Design a protein with these regions (language model features):
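A short, charged/proline- and glycine-enriched loop
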Residues: 14-16, 292-295
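Alpha/beta enzyme core
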Residues: 2-229, 240-243, 247-250, 287
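Active-site loops and adjacent core secondary-structure elements that bind or stabilize anionic groups
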Residues: 232
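Alpha-helix N-cap/helix-start capping motif
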Residues: 24-25, 235, 322
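N-terminal glycine-rich phosphate-binding loop and ensuing alpha1 helix
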Residues: 293-324
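Residues at the C-termini of beta-strands that transition into short coil/loop
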Residues: 212, 253-256, 301, 320
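Extended, intrinsically disordered, low-complexity segments
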Residues: 7, 236-292
Length: 324
């Protein structure tokens, strides 16, 4: 099944779906290997992995380059956290074209102004685009996509900027009417009060996605009862990776040794495995000339060895079934 079709199925199936954050090829592959059915390509996590702020400091082309590695490394759908679409409707059209070329299944666009500010940063200006302008972005995205299953998700930031339920519902309804395949209702409260109120009042057939980063203590069963479509675990891969790296770095710095830490970290062999080293070894056997040719003789000479198995002493190499 196409990745776009997989994502659309996740959004519209009656069971609660989950998307897990990833920010590069390695984390995306780990997400799939763990068993998740879809990936959230987080703007915060990608920015953090590049060492920049989540304020559109990473260009959209840099994000797309990372997405290409993520897509190549996985077979499950990726939903991009596309911020505001990186500009106006025309930037959105260009973005959709490039995402489809890289087999990205969908994009989530928020109704704030470019350049955006992360929704959880306190004290910074959080300005919303007009509903009409944002509806134009949604229509432009839907008109641009070639694959009918490519998903455009409209992220509603009304609660984030301090507006009430009526404003959130009005915006979400307008975005659904403009053609959004789903709406994402966002909240920075520590409880799910706003989300519960929204879901109880939502009467559209368009599925609703949530991001419980702040109201993480809410039991998942509550989301099922509310008929939420999809839950996004939005930044927990990058945050756990940061904690693990900081712990390892601190230990090595303090002890000036890797003896204590080595048993606690992933072995190099596991790194090779997730990179697909075994597949490359098999491919070398199929495609490299002379890979499986038996050695019939050895000429000892000065200079670098041309023998592939360089780690084996020449006296131990098999010639005609016997070592020298």
């Amino acid at each position: 099944m196409k990745k776009t079709s997989q994502l659309k199925q996740l959004l519209y199936q009656p069971e609660l779906s989950f998307l897990m954050e990833a920010h590069n090829g390695l984390s995306a592959r780990l997400v799939e290997q763990t068993g998740f059915s879809g990936i959230w390509a987080s703007g915060l996590a990608i920015s953090a992995s590049l060492g920049v702020r989540d304020n559109n400091e990473a260009s959209w082309t840099q994000v797309v380059d990372i997405l290409e590695f993520m897509s190549d490394a996985t077979s499950i759908p990726i939903l991009l956290d596309g911020d505001t679409g990186y500009g106006n409707f025309n930037n959105v059209r260009r973005l959709i074209k490039k995402l489809e070329q890289r087999d990205i299944a969908g994009v989530c666009i928020e109704d704030k102004l470019f350049p955006k500010t992360n929704s959880f940063i306190q004290g910074e200006q959080q300005d919303l685009a007009s509903s009409d302008e944002f509806c134009g972005k949604i229509k432009a995205a839907k008109d641009t996509q070639v694959d009918p299953d490519f998903c455009v998700v409209a992220r509603v930031e009304a609660f984030i900027v301090g507006l009430g339920l009526d404003a959130a519902l009005a915006r979400a309804s307008a975005y659904a009417d403009a053609g959004a395949d789903a709406v994402l209702i966002h909240s920075k409260q520590s409880t799910a009060t706003q989300i519960i109120a929204f879901m109880q009042a939502w009467d559209k057939a368009v599925p609703v996605i949530i991001v419980p980063t702040k109201y993480y203590a809410t039991p998942t069963e509550v989301f099922r009862q509310l008929r939420v479509s999809t839950v996004i675990w939005a930044n927990h891969t990058i945050r756990s990776a940061m904690q693990a790296m900081q712990s390892t770095l601190t230990t090595i710095y303090k002890t000036q040794s890797i003896k204590e830490i080595d048993p606690q970290i992933t072995p190099v062999s596991a790194v090779f495995k997730i990179q697909g080293a075994d597949e490359l070894a098999d491919a070398e056997k199929r495609y490299l000339p002379g890979y499986n040719t038996a050695i019939s003789g050895i000429i000892l000479a000065a200079g670098a060895s041309r023998i592939r198995d360089i780690d084996t002493p020449k006296c131990m190499l098999s010639v005609g079934g016997k070592s020298l």
